[in-house]
Design a protein with these regions (language model features):
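A cross-family signal for key residues in well-ordered alpha-helices
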Residues: 16, 44, 134
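N-terminal helix-turn-helix DNA-binding core of bacterial DNA-binding proteins
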Residues: 20, 24-66
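Short, hydrophobic-biased segments on the C-terminal half of alpha helices
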Residues: 56, 74-75
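Alpha-helical linker/hinge and terminal dimerization helices associated
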Residues: 18, 22, 29, 63, ...
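N-terminal leader segment of winged-helix/HTH proteins
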Residues: 1-33, 80
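N-terminal positioning helix adjacent to the helix-turn-helix/winged-helix DNA-binding module
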Residues: 11, 38-41, 55, 102, ...
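Charged, amphipathic alpha-helical coiled-coil/dimerization segments
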Residues: 75-135
Length: 144
């Protein structure tokens, strides 16, 4: 098709296509734990940040998503017994998040899977070219 020349030169199409492929890849990778990518990132964050306080608003800012999206993920993780909400002692309207024991085990599996995926990317294209590509994509995406 004639449009293919345009598509082959379009960074927007390339990034969108890559995003769809990465979504499919992470869905497959996280299927055993029935997690989506954002839920996996939340578990990994809670694991790495512990014992520091993690608030949903911080997660929303960090992952550049809405508080509603984070709230939905937290509710899902909480329903599966992976995380718990704790009322903020300084502000009863707010709460902190913590991993439950099963959530900690799941977080370790998620971290291992994401780490392996990162190593696979680095092996496929090389560490330096991957970092260069990330810088380019971030510059196209604009200021964070």
């Amino acid at each position: 098709m004639r449009i293919e020349t345009f598509l082959n030169q379009s960074p927007m199409f390339c990034i969108t296509l890559a995003a769809r492929r990465f979504d499919a890849l992470t869905s497959q990778l996280l299927a055993a734990d029935d997690l989506n990518f954002l839920e996996a990132l939340i578990l990994a964050t809670l694991f790495f940040e512990s014992p520091a306080i993690v608030k949903p608003s911080h997660l929303a800012d960090t992952f550049a998503t809405t508080r509603g999206n984070i709230s939905h993920c937290i509710s899902s993780l909480e329903a599966r017994g992976l995380v718990q909400r704790k009322i903020d002692p300084d502000d009863a309207r707010a709460y902190h998040l913590a991993l439950k024991p099963h959530g900690r085990k799941t977080a370790l599996r998620v971290i291992a899977a994401l780490d392996k995926l990162q190593r696979d990317f680095e092996t496929k294209v090389g560490k330096a070219p991957l970092q260069s590509a990330l810088r380019t994509i971030r510059s196209l995406a604009g200021p964070s």
